């Protein structure tokens, strides 16, 4: 059995990263289908809360296997900077101001608030900020702003589900605008502070606050 030379190893690494990046974008499509099925109530909330972790776990897994580090996937604990705190505070206020006025109060469900809401917030950040954003950064290399915007566009499109319930397209576009702008904020903060932990916590808190409401038709 021949031993690969150093040059072969160097050549293989970019190829592995391109394949891993393509796989993560394919996972985004699968995750979008999964989210749409959940919006259409084809998946139960417990099932979706559990299955929703798979895209992030698989996405991070293929990136790490391709040679990206845990730091490049923002899977580390690091302090929250003042600027990062300011951005997260702005996202928190903006997101709740955008979604709560169109929600219908249903009352507190403690399992929904303290199990499903955190599960959704953490799983979304695991995929979008720790898998999709690093994949976009790998694809666009030095064009970091473009990569962050692209991952935010895909985060917005991930919320297309209401369109399949008959919601008018302009309203769906407005719905997708909220996660698009929030995604830019989360993406900036995660890159700035080098960790996805704070975005996971804040995203979960948004859904804890919103959990007593129902949205959509």
Task: Name every feature range the model reports, one short phrase each.
Residues 107-217:
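Transmembrane helix-loop-helix hairpins at the membrane interface
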Residues 17-25, 82-89, 151:
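Select subsegments of transmembrane alpha-helices in polytopic membrane proteins
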Residues 27-37, 92-102, 152-161, 204-213:
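Aromatic-anchored segments of alpha-helical transmembrane domains
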Residues 36-52, 62-126, 133-134, 138:
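Juxtamembrane helix-loop-helix connectors linking adjacent transmembrane helices
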Residues 15-18, 69-76, 164-169:
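Membrane-interface interhelical linkers
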Residues 1-70, 190, 208-217:
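N-terminal, membrane-interfacial amphipathic/helix-forming hydrophobic leader that caps
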């Amino acid at each position: 059995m021949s031993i690969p030379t150093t040059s072969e190893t160097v050549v293989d690494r970019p190829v592995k990263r391109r394949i891993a990046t393509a796989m993560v974008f394919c996972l985004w499509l699968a995750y979008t289908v999964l989210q749409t099925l959940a919006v259409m109530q084809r998946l139960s909330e417990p099932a979706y809360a559990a299955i929703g972790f798979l895209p992030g776990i698989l996405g991070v897994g293929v990136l790490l296997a391709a040679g990206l580090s845990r730091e490049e996937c923002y899977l580390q604990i690091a302090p929250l900077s003042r600027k990062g705190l300011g951005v997260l505070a702005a996202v928190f206020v903006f997101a709740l101001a955008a979604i709560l006025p169109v929600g219908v109060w249903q009352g507190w469900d403690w399992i929904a608030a303290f199990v499903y809401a955190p599960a959704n917030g953490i799983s979304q950040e695991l995929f979008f900020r720790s898998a999709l954003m690093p994949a976009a950064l790998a694809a666009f290399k030095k064009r970091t702003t473009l990569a962050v915007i692209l991952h935010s566009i895909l985060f917005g499109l991930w919320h297309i589900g209401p369109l399949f319930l008959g919601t008018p397209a302009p309203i769906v576009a407005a719905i997708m605008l909220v996660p698009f702008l929030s995604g830019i904020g989360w993406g900036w903060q995660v890159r700035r502070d080098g960790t996805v932990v704070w975005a996971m916590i804040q995203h979960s808190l948004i859904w804890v606050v919103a959990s007593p409401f129902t949205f959509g038709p």
